[in-house]
């Protein structure tokens, strides 16, 4: 079970360890949308429509310090099981 997403930007226009704010915003938006869509699949709501509130909260991305900056989600096994149980209810 994957709990972290590690992102490496290769051949970017900015110097190593840097990213333009507009590029960061676009990247964060795209990654959040992808994560939300993937998170919706286990509860069989992959189609269009508003995502349930608890699903939005559990699929939120956050960043953590790293050599540069690694974006990641830290979700323990217990939290994931509680999420699945709530999703199936």
From Swiss-Prot:
Highest taxon of source: Bacteria
Annotated protein name in UniProt: Uncharacterized protein Mb2339
Species the sequence originates in: Mycobacterium bovis (strain ATCC BAA-935 / AF2122/97)
């Amino acid at each position: 079970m994957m709990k972290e997403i590690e992102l490496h930007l290769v051949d970017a226009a900015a110097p190593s360890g840097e990213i333009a704010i507009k590029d960061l915003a676009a990247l964060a938006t795209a990654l959040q949308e992808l994560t939300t869509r993937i998170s919706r699949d286990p509860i069989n709501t992959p189609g269009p429509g508003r995502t349930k509130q608890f699903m939005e909260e559990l699929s939120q991305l956050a960043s953590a310090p790293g050599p540069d900056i690694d974006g990641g989600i830290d979700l323990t096994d217990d939290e994931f099981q509680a999420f699945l149980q709530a999703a199936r209810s």
